[in-house]
Amino acid sequence: MRRRSRMLLCFALLWVLGIAYYMYSGGGSALAAGGGGAGRKGDWNDIDSIKKKDLHHSRGDEKAQGVETLPPGKVRWPDFNQEAYVGGTMVRSGQDPYARNKFNQVESDKLHMDRGIPDTRHDQCQRKQWRVDLPATSVVITFHNEARSALLRTVVSVLKRSPPHLIKEIILVDDYSNDPEDGALLGKIEKVRVLRNDRREGLMRSRVRGADAAQAKVLTFLDSHCECNERWLEPLLERVAEDRTRVVSPIIDVINMDNFQYVGASADLKGGFDWNLVFKWDYMTPEQRRSRQGNPVAPIKTPMIAGGLFVMDKLYFEELGKYDMMMDVWGGENLEISFRVWQCGGSLEIIPCSRVGHVFRKQHPYTFPGGSGTVFARNTRRAAEVWMDEYKHFYYAAVPSARNVPYGNIQSRLELRKKLGCKPFKWYLDNVYPELRVPDHQDIAFGALQQGTNCLDTLGHFADGVVGIYECHNAGGNQEWALTKEKSVKHMDLCLTVVDRSPGSLIRLQGCRENDSRQKWEQIEGNSKLRHVGSNLCLDSRTAKSGGLSVEVCGPALSQQWKFSLNLQQ
């Protein structure tokens, strides 16, 4: 009995020693790590998830499997002193919190650098697994006088919500900010490199400098006031890894400029533009939405990207001509690169399983040499002259003042287009953006018929219905009209019709008929009014709230001021 007790005691002692050895040698690391309370869902810097390690760390990659040794002078992002970095630039009492950045800096400065944000992805994305052999990326972020708190959150969100082995580096390109330490101090953070321009270069040239310095095979461009969401990077890298000619963008969520609330954006949007070449968001057509019901997280082909956030193969970026280096400051570059990618054999996609928040401002916080309008027109003219062929005339019809803005030498870009064997703009319209209505050869004015911030609208009415005004939405549809050479004001096959030729009578929508005098209109007074030919009365909105638009005796009233967004007769 005594011998049996000794044996049991020995076995128990060996068992305890075995457990201790197992824990000490790392076999219990998952358990040990789980006891800390600092871990957060989706934080790739945690080590309490063996599943994540198995899925996302390449076999044999010892650095990815363990903790890397930092170079001298570097710190991990959780150890970076946010208070010291942000504190000296905070808005003082009595100062305008919007003055420096055109967003509420006070609210931005209150937030922690790794604040939690809602996971806005579709449920299917949260269950999806991504390839384990994805390439690493260099993240290029350019900035000029950015609020330190916003810039820091951008950097931290990249490091916190990305698999460490997929972030080769973060390259901050300081475009000659007033305070060099805005970027220099962030250079202490792991994986962050800082480049500073010795003069103001603008977004395009700064991004090219960052791309040229990048060491990874894939480039990720981000604006300097973003917050990356959970698992944002893998879906983008996977699409590029499958086809290097894809240029991919996340769904861009909204960070409110006033209170910095993070709000998920619709997944039913694509990038587009009007003939003024200003970027806009287009809703998918009903047919496109129906076709996605079986797979709502499938990539979305988009005619245009917003330009601030996208991922692209580095070698393809170089082969395709990088950016137009003669574009200045900001604006038009997304238009130019979108045309170039599509027309030269690539594609643009929005990836629903990738979400990145962005602070959308109503105006720019920095100055433009010559004014923002002139810079945008110059950049846009360069894109139009190189890529739009004969369709550029619709741009000049929409923005007549652009004709007077010098756009510089474009010979090298034209030669690039020829060298790459790019398709004509008509191909782009037919195959990539068929939703963009092209004016008919019979049209002398086209697009929205604007009165201040309101536009002429069918209000969903059909034949014999009245028309009204509604806030301009720039989406065509019920607000798309054309004035033809036959003097008809048309919406599809319906025309504005004066049934009763007396002042105050309501306008009706009726089927267009050739030579019907009730449907004849002309622009007068510098194309600022529409006069009915048969009655000499003018289109008027004064009765819009009580029943619909009418014709009235022509006069100086603002209710008679109308302007087509695209006027082909100047």
Curated annotation (Swiss-Prot):
InterPro entries: GalNAc-T, Glyco_trans_2-like, Nucleotide-diphossugar_trans, Ricin_B-like_lectins, Ricin_B_lectin
Its EC number(s): 2.4.1.41
Residues involved in substrate binding: 142, 175, 200, 224, 330, 361, 364, 366
Positions of Mn(2+) binding: 223, 225, 358
Tissue: Widely expressed at high level.
Molecular-function annotations in GO: carbohydrate binding; manganese ion binding; polypeptide N-acetylgalactosaminyltransferase activity
Cytoplasmic side: 1-6
Residue ranges annotated for the Ricin B-type lectin domain, each copy included: 442-565
Name listed for the protein in its UniProt record: Polypeptide N-acetylgalactosaminyltransferase 2
Organism, as annotated: Mus musculus (Mouse)
The gene coding this protein: Galnt2
